[in-house]
UniProtKB/Swiss-Prot annotation:
ATP binds at residues 246-253. Its EC number is 3.6.4.13. It is found in: Nucleus, Nucleolus. It holds the Pfam family DEAD. Belongs to the DEAD box helicase family. DDX24/MAK5 subfamily. ATP-binding RNA helicase involved in the biogenesis of 60S ribosomal subunits and is required for the normal formation of 25S and 5.8S rRNAs. The gene is mak5. Residues 1-37, 87-183, 689-718 are annotated as: Disordered. The keyword Phosphoprotein does not apply. One of its GO terms (biological process) is rRNA processing. Residues 1-10, 140-182 have a biased composition (Basic and acidic residues). This is ATP-dependent RNA helicase mak5. The keyword Nucleus applies.
Amino acid sequence: MGQKRQRDQKGSGFQSKKRKRGANSSNADDKDDGWDGIVGVEDLNWKEVALPDRLDDAEGFFGLEEIEGVDIVRPEGSGEIRFKAKAGKPKKSILKNKTIPQEDKTFDDEWEGFSDGEAAQETTTTEPTEEPVQTTNEETEVKEKKEPKKKEAKKEVKKDAKNAKKEPKKKDLPSQKDKDIKPGLSFAALQDAEEDDGVDISAWESLGLSPEILNSLSKLKFSSPTAVQKSCIPPILDGHDVVGKASTGSGKTLAFGIPILEYYLEKKRRETKNKDDKKETSPIALILSPTRELAHQLVKHIGEVITHAPGVNARIALLTGGLSVQKQQRLLNGADIVIGTPGRVWEVLSGGQGLISKMKEIKYLVVDEADRLLSEGHFKEAHEILAALDREEINDFPGAEEDESDDEDSKTQRQTLVFSATFHRDLQQKLAGKGKWTGSDLMNKQESMEYLLKKLNFREEKPKFIDVNPVSQMAEGLKEGIVECAAMEKDLYLYTLLLYHPKHRTLVFTNSISAVRRLTQFLQALQLPALALHSSMAQKARLRSVERFSSPTADPSTILVATDVAARGLDIKGIDFVIHYHAPRTADTYVHRSGRTARAGASGKSVIICAPEEMVGVVRLAAKVHANMANGKRLPLESLELDRRIVSRVKQRVTLAARICDANIAKEKVSAEDNWLKNAAEELGVDYDSEEFDERQGRGRGRGRGRQQRERQASSISKAELAGMRAELKQLLSQRVNVGVSERYLTSGRVDIEALLRGEGNASFLGQVDPLGF
């Protein structure tokens, strides 16, 4: 046992000696290094702190510098503060290049100058060459000149081996012919050539567009330009500021999108000719939109032209709320066209560094739906953006005069393009007010221009005002109607109108978010495919609703219940019917709501469900919108008479669906209020009794007491009663609406048996129903 212990002691002693040797060797390396890593303030690699573009009050904090990854060291016996690198960070990373200690660069022998062979190699490498392989050899030779002479022979052998490995790679380098081929035209061009050539675009040739854009228009089946495109594209290409007014669905997006892409192609050709390859490019256009849906639609339409145009690789950055700010900032770095809503655009520009100065270099500023963006009390960020683009920075530093002159030049080069279907400020006034009202011509050119000149800083004193349809703001193929009913019967008449128009993609507009939620559940209870869209929804949910509604594979009877967030710019093919559940508050809102149908020369219908208290506003609306009509009708909207038999037969369905919907909404609201009160009571440490609280609330008086009582009664409906109402409603919906036909003796009435068997006609009714004469 003693021998074993003796051996263990020797082994442990041997291991400890090894550890000591390792420690001594590391210490020896540190000693050989000759530098402990502690430096002064002057030796650190300080970096200047970048301030944001928008800083209202800096309070003198300019010229600040910072450094990361250092620890503060106070040597004993000295009051001077010194620094060293943090653990795990290289010591040299915190130093300036000139302050790296020279002891690290220890050589084995002295440098004895250049040899004759090296001089010859230097003369050969100074000759210009185009092959990238030789440039790498030149770098290695420059490094060899700094090495000692004893290591020269070994490095020459290594260099020859590297060259031997690199020589076969020369075969893989592209030839001069391959360099001339554009990367965007590889196999995509062959695929496009195999497809059909598109439509005849001879009508576009008079506008002087490039072959790339004409090719894209041909593939997109745009055979001829619309009136607004034919009138606006030439002056925009000539460099004029343009104010374009046209009816909804007339193609205003391409009226300003095509000139922007033409300028992009011209800029690209200029850079290719001058061989100017700049990695950092500033945007050429900023397009502002009032809603997120319109911004996404602008990206889609302009992106389709870019996709089908060979050689057009313009990048579009979309800046809208509801999405990641960091991702949008990254997209903005290399973007050519910026499209967004004013709130998010201003958030990105004001929080970034150097973004506002980049935006000052844009060639085009496009304000889409300008009357909405520039209206009083709305979109404060839009005014901030316009002010920032026109603001001149005054500096006291050397060269400030040159910067100011550059800003003035960029300001004079920027074109301002304004588009909308309505411009006059009077159309934005509320229709239900008691103020003075006249039915005179309110849409003249002079007042519209004065309104815009106050809001925007045009380059020209008098921009070109192009009014494609000065007489009416409504589309030519649009039919307008009105249904008069009691205020409590709007649900009934809405359902009846939907039954009259099966397989029609319908858009229902309301004035409140709560009405959207209630109507969506109400229509879904009636087994109708209804979707909701309002501003309180998450961005992904909004995009999902629009996608489901506009999908070609969707049910043709899909109904979208929306607020005025969908009234402007939403271009969805196949919308046949627009219903105004609430009368619009302003005339311009009615114009844009009705403009969702009858787009691009198609036909469509727009119907207002009007209660007696809304009639005054509707009369004023019709007089303002149709002020220039030849006939002097007091109400130019056509009055629709629905079949009273159908209205009475579907009333039971509507009543059950409304009760089910109101009960569900009331239960959700009561449970949410109870949860909030319960949580508040727990935080305060008091007892909460829901019944006692309801009794105290019921004793009070005031506005809204009747609504609260109805909600309380609706929430008290049990699950069994709800299930019974759902079963009864399901049974009613399984049957067709009988309009006076004997179900036992079908042949005795006005029933076409063959049409029933073939599935023709309106499947909602049993019997002959005359369509609305409208």
